[in-house]
Amino acid sequence: MLKKIPNILTIGRIIIVPFFVLAFYLPGFYGDLTALILFVVASFTDFLDGMLARMMGEESKLGELLDPIADKIIVATALILLVMDGTIRNYEVIAAIIILTREILISGLREFLAKGKIKLPVSSLAKLKTVLQMVSIALLLSGDTGNKIINFQDYNAQTIGIILLWLSAALTLFTGYDYMRKGIDHAMSEAVSYTHLTLPTKRIV
């Protein structure tokens, strides 16, 4: 049972999403607070399930499949909701589009490479990018309450959240390019290896 905990946490993160959406649209302080708590819980389980899987040596196929899907669903849902309600607006929407586009492209790349049994390891910068995304979204979800708690001169929770969103978008571009380059290199090397194996050798008469 203990070995199944990482997968249970991952599935739980997906189950949280509809409740997060519902809480986001609840009016007032408690709606904001509930949405924030659900997002923070989902973000924490992302860290926790990976850590437990490595500690137990139980990085299952199901976990490998569902974990990145769960991450992308919660982040994409939060960003779309924040754009729709105007928290992320004007040029700030570009940062959200960059993040969402990168996630779609890299997911497709991973799926393509998986057919050739090629894995792209998660880089340290990609992990930092994920942390910045989660923190920025949490700050933006905190609303007016967050602004009252975090307020340093011209910098409140919303302002800091937007700054971190742009930073995560910049890292998203960099890590996305890095993944695409590595993925193409892997695919090309596999194609060359396959060609060498399948092409008939020329006989010398």
Language model: regions and residue ranges:
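Short juxtamembrane and helix-loop transition motifs at transmembrane-helix boundaries
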Residues: 1, 57-62, 88
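Short, hydrophobic transmembrane alpha-helix segments
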Residues: 22-30
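Conserved small/polar residues in nucleotide/adenosyl-binding loops
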Residues: 195-201
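A feature for the membrane-embedded catalytic helix bundles of lipid/isoprenoid biosynthetic enzymes
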Residues: 2-22, 36-40, 69-194
